Amino acid sequence: MNKENLKKLCLQSIDAHKEDIIALGEDIFRHPELGFKERRTSQIFSDTLEELGIPCRKGIARTGVKGRLAGAVPGPNVMLMGELDAVVSPLHPCADLETGAAHACGHNSQIAAVLGAAMGLAPLKGLLGGDVTFAAVPAEEYVELEFRQSLQEKGEIEFMGGKQEFVRLGVLEDVDMGLMIHSHAGVTERRFLLDCFSSGFIGKVIRFTGKEAHAGSRPFDGINALNAAALSLLAIGTQRETFREADRIRIHPIITKGGDLVNIVPADVRMETYVRGMSMEAILSASEKVNRCLKGSAYSIGAGVEIDELPGYMPLHQDKTLSRLFAENGERLLGPDTGIWGEELLGSTDAGDLSALMPFIHVSTGGYAGDAHAKNFTICDKEMAYVMPAKAMALTVIDLLYDKGETARSIRKNFVPRFTRESYLAFWDKFRRGETCGDGF
């Protein structure tokens, strides 16, 4: 069967399942689950794949799923990936009343689109020049850190992000390249946003330690850890002129505990911060400056400081050839000039980690109103949110795996990874460290 007929058969199958795809997306939207807890959504994903005759591996990194559709011959393995988790947005009208979880980032659309693509590609089993992997990953949103640290302590996970766990567990060793889509809040029209950039980040959990004393009668006997924290915020702010504009450094700390009682000099003060940037080199440089500010501020007050570094996510660098293929199929579906290219999205995603290991794209899609992670986030065009991405991904897979997968082979051959799996894990393992400055009290 020629490529055009394969594409027509695929689109016919997706159109036949259009209402099912939308219903899946809407059902997941109404039942949001937070990272590493996405039991219901994971079950929906695996059940749907198995109904299509696609065998699944379940329980990866607690809730992840990996299904595989075999090709006609051994060849490249192309992955379509979706994220299972919701974000914490308790004011959203569809938020879970107990957890505050809401699909205010549109990950429900990803799962529906991957399953929709599977519905289009399943009838092509044995007709493609390689395999298709359908993956559902947990925990893209970097939230509930205490819960995730408890999982680390129990040995259930090592990384905070689901894709990082997939890498650690070796689940992606047989995958040659990956595609996924993501909502773009505020883009209501039918557009695909291609080859966009996202920053990487690292996290810090900080504890300033001082000495308690009565804040009214004998404050001079104490050492005020809150003063050390406040001074560190000022010191970090004065670093801004040292950051290059091209590096897009963002540092945004918060104080999570300012003391215990108002009439006691604070002796235990907690902070958290991210350090973001467009390259790991820039992030690590800025991180060292932040650490100097933290340690210097503690020293000047006579306090102690503990700094725990948390592996974050790497910057996203999308494969340009994959992006062009997706764009061609997007224009087939939406019309000419419907692609938006090269926007800077200064949030972060663990898709960046995968882009350092394999050819990968993370296409943003229109069909959404409101703001990301906010109570006004909503899907205003359900066909654009759920069905069009399914079609675009499936058509791109056909392009990649037609003719014994020659296009996919070429993309993989020309890709230069920033890390191997081993060096990637070694990088983050070396980074995971803590620092202590001062004696504390």
Ranges and model annotations:
Residues 3-104, 108-133, 138:
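Acidic/His- and Gly-rich active-site-bordering loop/insert found
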Residues 4, 8-11, 15-22, 39, ...:
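Electropositive phosphate-/nucleotide-binding environments in soluble metabolic enzymes
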Residues 23, 62, 80, 129-138, ...:
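Beta-strand segments within the central parallel beta-sheet cores of soluble alpha/beta enzyme folds
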Residues 28, 67, 80, 107, ...:
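Divalent metal-coordination and catalytic microenvironments
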Residues 79-81, 204-209, 361-366:
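Non-cysteine beta-strand/loop elements that form the S-adenosyl-L-methionine
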Residues 92-102, 108-109, 121, 126-252, ...:
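Histidine/acidic-residue-rich, glycine-tolerant segments that coordinate divalent metal ions
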Residues 227-441:
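Metal-dependent amide/peptide-bond hydrolase catalytic core
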